[in-house]
Amino acid sequence: MTYSEQHLKEASEILTKLDTDAIEGMAALLVRVRADGGRLFFLGVGGSAGNCSHAVNDFRKIVGIEAYAPTDNVSELTARTNDEGWDTVFIEWLKISRLNDKDAVFVFSVGGGNLEKNVSPNLVRALQHAKSVGAAITGVVGRDGGFTATV
């Protein structure tokens, strides 16, 4: 079997394992956010921050949802990290953005956040805040899903 054939075979197997109900639920959530005039805040670190930037572009341009990613503003991100710490960088950004119950937070993360293991504690704290103000939470996470999968 060639490399290409093997890759396509594996990709096909992965596609059959996707949770289509979860995907439909995510789509319905995004439709509601747009209909309610809510905003979409993308959170991610490392390579996932790059995915967030791309998603902001697509959701604003193609879907027509007001969307933002705090990692797109490097000067604010680094100032907050320096002055307030990495653990709270996203929660403080969401607070100043007045995250509310019409909005949604969308996480891209392999680990999904875990305070005990010190995996993306900034995501966990941001999601705790999102939950406290009634914002919807969704995301694309790795197998374990971390804290993101529990909210």
Regions found by a protein language model. Give the residues of each.
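Generic N-terminal amphipathic, Lys/Arg-enriched alpha-helix
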Residues: M1-L18
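A short, well-structured juxtamembrane/interface segment
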Residues: L18-D36
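Short glycine-rich anion-binding loops that position phosphate/pyrophosphate groups of nucleotides
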Residues: G46-S48, V110-G113
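Surface-exposed amphipathic alpha-helices with a cationic face
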Residues: R60, L127-G134
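Short beta-strand/turn micro-motifs composed of small residues
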Residues: T71, S109, G139-G142
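Glycine/threonine-rich flexible loop motifs
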Residues: G113-L123
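Short, glycine/polar-rich helix-capping loops at beta-to-alpha or helix-loop-helix junctions
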Residues: G139-V151
